[in-house]
A protein has these predicted regions:
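Beta-strand-rich recognition domains
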Residues: 1-20, 40-88
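Beta-strand-rich interaction surfaces with strong enrichment in secreted/lumenal proteins
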Residues: 28-29, 37-41
Length: 88
């Protein structure tokens, strides 16, 4: 396993990010407000999922990075909530 840094760039709000390795994930979030970065351990030849929940004022831009590489960017809509999932 190697270590990589998961990080978020956001001006305001709260967030929870979870990297999912297997179908039966432990449910522990890897990056939680107020921390803006966390070290995670991954296997280079394994596919992972990312689930994110962000609560922030409407129009707040955010970017999520893995080892400095942009993997997701978005903007919080009028509900004040942005949530979703992606493959990393």
């Amino acid at each position: 396993m190697i270590e990589k840094t998961l990080s978020i760039e956001i001006a305001h709000g709260r967030w929870m990010l979870d990297v999912i390795a297997e179908h039966d994930d432990d449910g522990v979030f890897d990056l939680v407000y107020p921390n803006k970065d966390a070290v995670i351990k991954v296997n280079e030849d394994h596919m992972y999922g990312l689930e994110y929940n962000i609560s922030a004022p409407e129009g707040t831009d955010f970017k999520i990075f893995l080892d400095g590489e942009l993997i997701l960017d978005g903007k919080v809509d009028k509900t004040g909530i942005s949530r979703g999932s992606s493959i990393i």
